[in-house]
């Protein structure tokens, strides 16, 4: 499916700015559309609400950081745009089904298994 230019621009803006506090209003202003119009268009083309897409993108980025970096969980929370690490942990747990510490420990377990099998 091919997204409209407005939705492509909104998605690009999210990908470029997910690490800070952004809103539908801000993105709508950036692409010269009303928030109501962007909200409807985004949902109709992507199947997701703007806020759900933003949250999903942030939490998937966080998962990648938990797996691929040694950053502390609170650092990752800030790096993906959350201002409160405890809220980040709650949202991560709700979205991923496990807490960020579990994702991190699974990575550590996998890397040890690889090391021990050599």
Task: Place the predicted regions along the sequence by residue.
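Terminal helix-turn-helix DNA-binding modules in bacterial transcription factors
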Residues: 11-12, 44-83, 105-118
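Hydrophobic, helix-rich cores of sensory/ligand-binding and other regulatory modules
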Residues: 1-3
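Basic/polar phosphate-binding segments, predominantly the helix-turn-helix DNA-binding elements
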Residues: 13, 21-57, 77-99
């Amino acid at each position: 499916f091919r997204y409209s230019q407005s939705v492509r621009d909104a998605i690009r803006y999210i990908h470029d700015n997910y690490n800070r506090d952004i809103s539908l209003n801000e993105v709508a202003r950036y692409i010269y559309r009303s928030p109501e119009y962007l909200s409807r268009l985004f949902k109709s083309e992507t199947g997701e609400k703007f806020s759900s897409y933003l949250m999903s993108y942030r939490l998937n980025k966080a998962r990648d950081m938990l797996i691929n970096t040694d950053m502390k969980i609170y650092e990752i929370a800030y790096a993906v745009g959350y201002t409160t690490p405890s809220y980040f942990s709650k949202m991560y747990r709700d979205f991923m089904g496990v807490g960020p510490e579990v994702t991190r420990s699974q990575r550590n377990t996998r890397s040890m298994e690889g090391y021990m099998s050599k």
